[in-house]
Amino acid sequence: MTHQVSVLHQDKKFDIALRPKGLREFCGQAQLTERLELFLSAALQRGEVPGHCLFFGPPGLGKTSLAHIVARTVGKGLVVASGPQLVKPSDLLGLLTSLQEGDVFFIDEIHRMGKVAEEYLYSAMEDYKIDITIDSGPGARSISVDLAPFSLVGATTRSGMLSEPLRARFSFSGRVSYYSDEDLATILKRSSNLLGIDADAAALYEIARRSRGTPRLANNLLRWVRDFAQMREGNRINSDVAEKALSMLLIDDWGLNEIDIKLLTTIIDYYQGGPVGIKTLSVAVGEDIKTLEDVYEPFLILKGLLKKTSRGRMVTQLAYNHLKRCSDNLQILGEEK
């Protein structure tokens, strides 16, 4: 038991170590990081606190890492909160008043903030002021409290759920996109060096191309391949070993996992290729709607295997080809949702 706790603690330390320390270490997202570096440098050169930043995109692509990089670049503290925990003004009050000048206030899943808490944040973002109600009943009064200038960094997987007033208060907004296989291989090379893993370039590329364009997943798979090689291959990691290790996880050569394939084959086998509504699909696959929409669908759509129409989800001819299925019953709908 002590050994297991030690291993978990060690892996947690590596999780932190794998996070890039600055924009120069952040591999991929070249246009985004170039704009962000210019934005931050210009503010610092003027002696100002940088404006508020919003990062949006699928999970696991580095939005949290970018928040840490912003704080490190500014050279101040980082205060972290999660949107679902911020429901009412009192949830924000202590966090906002604790901020020092130049601190970065990071809200993950900012689209899940409560509406009342979100509106309370507006004046804090725009004027660095908040109103506090003193007492209650007929004698209640409101006083305005000045806040130290700070930079808010928001991260969301669903930018469309942000209200326009909140979105408009961000000076910088950037989409974090899926990574190329080449960028992921570079990230894995850095990670393998930090973790002390001896893997050749072909093995790292094999892991990269099955990682769904997602660094977080790539690093997790790298650890799995390490464990597999340790127990089955005498710590030797080449492309063949990587392929065997990933096949054991039921990850195919396109990066599709068991749930991806179940989703596609369910539409093919039970709904003649679609269209099928997301609620029905959620029940059939056994995954909640949010997980399907945030985790699985974006990658399948990116790979051209799935499309969304006004009538529901449909598989594409490419999906039939990849799964080696007959597409005689495939319907053709051009209307996109």
From Swiss-Prot:
SUPFAM superfamilies, sorted: P-loop containing nucleoside triphosphate hydrolases, Winged helix' DNA-binding domain
Q: What does this protein do?
A: The RuvA-RuvB-RuvC complex processes Holliday junction (HJ) DNA during genetic recombination and DNA repair, while the RuvA-RuvB complex plays an important role in the rescue of blocked DNA replication forks via replication fork reversal (RFR). RuvA specifically binds to HJ cruciform DNA, conferring on it an open structure. The RuvB hexamer acts as an ATP-dependent pump, pulling dsDNA into and through the RuvAB complex. RuvB forms 2 homohexamers on either side of HJ DNA bound by 1 or 2 RuvA tetramers; 4 subunits per hexamer contact DNA at a time.
The name under which this protein is listed is Holliday junction branch migration complex subunit RuvB
EC numbers for this chain: 3.6.4.-
Q: Where is this region: Small ATPAse domain (RuvB-S)?
A: 180-250
Family in the record: Belongs to the RuvB family.
Q: Where in the cell is it found?
A: Cytoplasm
Q: Which InterPro entries match?
A: AAA+_ATPase, AAA_lid_4, DNA_helicase_Holl-junc_RuvB, P-loop_NTPase, RuvB-like_N, RuvB_C, WH-like_DNA-bd_sf, WH_DNA-bd_sf
Query: Subunit comment for this entry?
Result: Homohexamer. Forms an RuvA(8)-RuvB(12)-Holliday junction (HJ) complex. HJ DNA is sandwiched between 2 RuvA tetramers; dsDNA enters through RuvA and exits via RuvB. An RuvB hexamer assembles on each DNA strand where it exits the tetramer. Each RuvB hexamer is contacted by two RuvA subunits (via domain III) on 2 adjacent RuvB subunits; this complex drives branch migration. In the full resolvosome a probable DNA-RuvA(4)-RuvB(12)-RuvC(2) complex forms which resolves the HJ.
Print the keywords alphabetically: ATP-binding, Cytoplasm, DNA damage, DNA recombination, DNA repair, DNA-binding, Hydrolase, Nucleotide-binding
